[in-house]
Amino acid sequence: MPHIQPPILSQVPVIAAVCEPAIALTKERQSLKIEGSVTSKNFAMTGVAGYIAPRHLKAIVDTGSRLVAAMDPHDAVGILDRYSFDVRFFTEFERFDRHLEKLRRGPSGDRIDFLTVCSPNYLHDAHIRLALRIGADAICEKPLVINPWNLDALVELERETGRRVHTVLQLRLHPSLVALKQRLGASEHRHTVSLTYVTSRGRWYDVSWKGSADRSGGIATNIGIHFFDLLLWLFGPVTDSEVHLSDSGRMAGHLELERATVRWFLSTDRGDLPFAPQPGGKTTYRSITIDGEEVEFTEGFTDLHTQVYERVLAGEGFGIADARPSIELAYQIRHAKVTAPRISPHPLLA
């Protein structure tokens, strides 16, 4: 293991004084003007009945666009009426596909410009391919794919169709985290990081697609992918990785990144919460510490999806190359053998 110098926080004010640049960045994004925004873009969506879909529905409307068609095998989609009474809705993928193809062959003003993918993880790349095939860009929730080699086919399809695949890496736009990255970038010191994320789930979770590693990618992908992307974005690529715990509901390990040593712990087990959860109450605990100091970013999430859409429409969205490192890391973690820790493990394993 390489020698790790003790962190010197006084030389790197990582956590403190982030407000001023964060506010400036927020104002900059809020003032971002989308060229050509006078022309409303046509959107379609898969997975419109799902948990994350409302954030995308709001982002579509907030950016002056309109949803013209949506699909989900579940028909509890009354939320559509908050935004439009005219959305064509389908419960069968084949009929949805046929409708989008009909629009593609019709007047140019009716064609789909963007297909938003909010479906289960294992369907993401298939629905992205639909977008590219009908001449639309795709905006896809994390992860773009479960297995990293499927990214290569999407890169080829981008080249063949001239369309783009965009992913949603909204934490990279969070003002406090943007300011934190700027401050970290000014230092050559290595940092000691602890990541703890416990989001308790009931018995339904194991029955749903989310509880199936083949369909969700397991918890490293399903609940960990956005944190792994954040860590790689802040501290650079992986140089070493260990997995100390791996089962269907809990994973933990150690990462050596270019500029940090990371101990991480992910869980859907309510027994790992530092408090006693109650149905309908708080059921999630999230903590990231850098050199022993907590990173505070519990606020500021309300319009991050809208900011993602603004940047996509301005030609500045996150693409396949941005998503690849965290997808590869989550895949490696999912398939890694459990080993004894070579350094002190995460505190919840100690």
Where are these regions (language model features)?
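N-terminal Rossmann-like dinucleotide-binding module
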Residues: 19, 25-86
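C-terminal helix-rich "cap/oligomerization" subdomain common to oxidoreductases
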Residues: 19, 25-37, 102-107, 114-116, ...
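Beta-loop-alpha module in the N-terminal Rossmann-like domain of NAD(P)-dependent dehydrogenases
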Residues: 56, 89-139, 143-155
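A contiguous active-site-proximal alpha/beta segment in oxidoreductase catalytic domains
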Residues: 122, 145-203
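Rossmann-like dinucleotide-binding domain that binds NAD(P)(H)
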Residues: 203-272, 324-328
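C-terminal substrate-binding/catalytic lobe of Rossmann-fold NAD(P)-dependent oxidoreductases
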Residues: 248-304
